[in-house]
Design a protein with these regions (language model features):
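Domain-level signature for soluble enzymes in the chorismate/prephenate branch of the shikimate pathway
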Residues: 1-86
């Protein structure tokens, strides 16, 4: 397999990631609506820590730090988007 083949596979994964990201952000908007209706804060650190723990375990030692960075960024983006809707 040459580099072009590998990049083609990454492109397919990137396409899927964008679709999943958009779905996640749409759900984040629904969460923002719920939080607003129930007077809940946008930031939910306990929930974020729960997710970080779970995904870190799923990723394993080799990728834990990268997985935590990815999800921390996702949380920041979700909070930012929720704040625009709140």
């Amino acid at each position: 397999m040459d580099i072009t083949d590998i990049r083609d596979q990454i492109d397919v994964i990137d396409d899927a990631l964008v679709k999943l990201f958009l779905q996640r952000m749409q759900l984040s908007a629904q969460i923002a609506t719920y939080k607003k209706q129930h007077n809940l804060p946008v930031h939910a650190p306990a929930r974020e820590e729960e997710i970080l723990k779970k995904v870190s375990e799923q990723a394993g030692a080799d990728f834990e730090v990268y997985t935590r960075a990815l999800y921390t960024t996702l949380f920041e983006l979700s909070r930012s988007y929720q704040n625009t809707l709140y």
